[in-house]
Amino acid sequence: MKKLVSLALAAVLAVSTVGCGSSSDSSSSTADSAQSTEAAADGATFKIGGIGPITGGAAIYGQAVMNAAQMAVDKINADGGINGYQVEFRFEDDEHDAEKSVNAYNTLKDWGMQMLMGTVTSTPCTAVSAKTEEDNMFQLTPSGSAVESIAPANAFRVCFSDPNQGTASAQYIGENKLANKVAVIYNSSDVYSSGIYQTFATEAANQGFEIVAAEAFTEDSKTDFSVQLQKAKEAGAELVFLPIYYTEASIILTQANTMGYDPMFFGCDGMDGILGVENFDTSLAEDLMLLTPFVADAQDEKTQAFVSEYKEKFNDTPNQFAADTYDAMLIIKEAAEKAGVTPDMSVSDICEAMKTAMTEITFDGLTGERMTWSADGEPAKAPKAMKIVDGAYTAM
């Protein structure tokens, strides 16, 4: 089991979540028709697989990942591929389910996958990483943030880990004096949510605010939050921290409005996507804050070029998951070129070379400048704070 490496967050916090295969007809046909690129002239290609939810309650995440991965693969191939070899990419739906994610992994293995970019959400990612460890296959998850998701030595991530999200959130709330009394509503049956809560609670003691209510729910009780909200309201919570996914968060905001409770709401990367929830009154998310490494309205040239191309291709604004994924594919390219790997190498030999290369590269991407990785797979980069203003994500 890897040791968790702390991220250097303090400087950024002065300014400034998640993861089956279903090889259904729709998933397979999408992968076959839209997500495979032409092989190199000699027939040798790198085969990179992806896994995530493109149906179900977390589909906003998986769809963004699938889109951005293909964008990156198209760029890689247009620029000459990896070490002169073109890349084939195939994505499998896992519906944010661990068992289906393992099935998806097996489907991709049968296809000939040599490296895995995935999975998208934490619980499925943890299940799949146990399988990639058995096969010694290189794995880079864009967004699987649970500590356990990259426990094996072959697994790395682009996003922040859950513990670091919890610590960073508590620091931001405390340093910016957002509230004296804070409530937390979290999913005790989910490793992403409970992991963030635990380190948030620990760091809160150092930040000068009090957690006046810590209310849990489970996968079996995630449609009615009236009890948790009532306890937060009665405790006088001025801010409610929600280390959860956007679907449940949209229900909480709706129910809080119904009961006349109007605290500040604060989330992490799993909140990204709440403006796209079907039938949700997005005005209820006004002034909601979250920590994320990517803000689509940032004015730097790299972000604007990515957002413009993504909007043109998919008629949508990319979220953090899309940005993490675009970076992930280019990170794979950079590490593979550093390692000098070729498609004729075994999966295990590719993995061993990639593991070393990941600790030697420095990557400038959409989600961080001068990103580096330790041998335990953790990235060193810094988060940003984002607020929903006038129905749009806005950098703080």
Could you say what each language-model-derived stretch is?
Residues 155-216, 239:
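An alpha-beta-alpha
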Residues 17-34:
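Bacterial lipoprotein signal-peptidase II cleavage site
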Residues 60-67, 82-149, 217-225, 250, ...:
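Beta-alpha junction/loop-to-helix N-cap segments that form part of ligand/metal-binding clefts
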Residues 253-326, 387-389, 393-394:
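Extracellular/periplasmic periplasmic-binding protein-like sensory domains
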